Amino acid sequence: MSSHPPIRSYVLRQGYFSHAQRHAYESLLPRYGIPFSENPIDLDSIFGRTAPKILEIGSGMGETTVEIAAQHPEKDFVAIEVHAPGIGSLLDRIEKHGLTNLRIIPHDAKLVLQHMLTGESLDGIHIFFPDPWPKARHHKRRLIQSDFVSLLCNRLKPGGYLHIATDWEDYAIHSLHVLSSEQRLINTAADYAPRPAYRPLTKFEQRGMKLGHTIRDLIFTKAA
């Protein structure tokens, strides 16, 4: 067995943890959180219904996650986030919006996918603005790698989709190559897809567009 620690796609930075975020984290995580487990979970049982299940990896502060879930009450959403301020912020938003179709798993996405989620259990996967790790020596830390995409495919139902959005051209090119190399995935566009109506424009994205940044969406579906 290798003694090398796994390469992580994130760094747990000690960011500002507001009183409201901390309070939400401590008081609401038992209600809306799903504890990490090395055993598979039944999402239908957790949500109390049979409905399409969408996974979001890296929900940030939760603004987009909550907006999408609020606009689509017919679907169930599972967010994965590791940074405490973001977890607290998302929990606070869930409570204020009264959402019953959104839960969060505060753990490493790769471990969640490997242990908790079963094969062909997801109807869609969102990865919006992952850390681009722009320096060449850090490219190995990028989340979108062939082995990880293969794992995502295993968890997607046939006909399910994988949606990645990034404002880094180099990361978009990298992701397009990795996704196109996965034989089970089919690109819905010639290269980059138009932004679908369900993905709202974030404040971060609007600022970037004013500065001339191009946002690129990649949407692939799993072959039936």
Curated annotation (Swiss-Prot):
The active site is at 131. S-adenosyl-L-methionine binds at residues 56, 81, 108, 131. Pfam families: Methyltransf_4 (PF02390). Its EC number is 2.1.1.33. It catalyses: guanosine(46) in tRNA + S-adenosyl-L-methionine = N(7)-methylguanosine(46) in tRNA + S-adenosyl-L-homocysteine. It is an enzyme of class 2 (transferase). Keywords: Methyltransferase, S-adenosyl-L-methionine, Transferase, tRNA processing. Pathway: tRNA modification; N(7)-methylguanine-tRNA biosynthesis. SUPFAM superfamilies: S-adenosyl-L-methionine-dependent methyltransferases. GO terms for cellular component: tRNA methyltransferase complex. Substrate binds at residues 135, 167, 202-205. InterPro entries: SAM-dependent_MTases_sf, tRNA_(Gua-N-7)_MeTrfase_Trmb, tRNA_methyltr_TrmB_bact. NCBIfam families: tRNA (guanosine(46)-N7)-methyltransferase TrmB. HAMAP family: tRNA_methyltr_TrmB. Catalyzes the formation of N(7)-methylguanine at position 46 (m7G46) in tRNA. Belongs to the class I-like SAM-binding methyltransferase superfamily. TrmB family. This is tRNA (guanine-N(7)-)-methyltransferase. It comes from Nitrosomonas eutropha (strain DSM 101675 / C91 / Nm57). The lineage of its organism: Bacteria, Pseudomonadati, Pseudomonadota, Betaproteobacteria, Nitrosomonadales. The gene is trmB.
